[in-house]
């Protein structure tokens, strides 16, 4: 678990500088219009050359992501945006899963739990685990699997 309190924390995870080796990266964020929402910091708190916006989108993912061998699951609203998914693909993610629209927070939790349960306990393929988690209800049905 990594706590993200500033843009450079997310950059460290996406770039691999502060990410432990893991097959799955679950990004639990709020999202809006296909961008991750980060805490807004006071100007004097930002580090030199740090991204200065509470929105972190496809352009920033393109700039920083090095995700070879990692499957990414993002739980925030609208993070299933095609441009964002393409940015993760460009960063060499094995796959990207996220909701295409505003999604209920409880549904996001349930989706991730069911997806991981299917992978771990039932040795399901990624596709089968995704389909079972997506099929729970209309809210979990908002999740999309890219590449």
Which functions belong to the PLM regions below?
Residues 1-6, 98-103, 131:
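A generic structural motif
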Residues 1-22:
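Functional beta-strand-loop-alpha-helix junction segments that form "active/interaction loops"
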Residues 45-109:
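Catalytic cores of nucleophile-dependent amide-cleaving enzymes
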Residues 108-120:
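Short, small-residue alpha-helix embedded
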Residues 2-3, 25-27, 73, 96-98:
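A structural signal for short, well-ordered beta-strand segments and their strand-loop junctions
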Residues 23-43, 91-96:
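Active-site microenvironments of hydrolase-like enzyme catalytic domains
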Residues 8-9, 31-35, 78-81, 103-104:
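Short acidic, S/G/P-rich loop/turn micro-motifs used as interaction or catalytic elements
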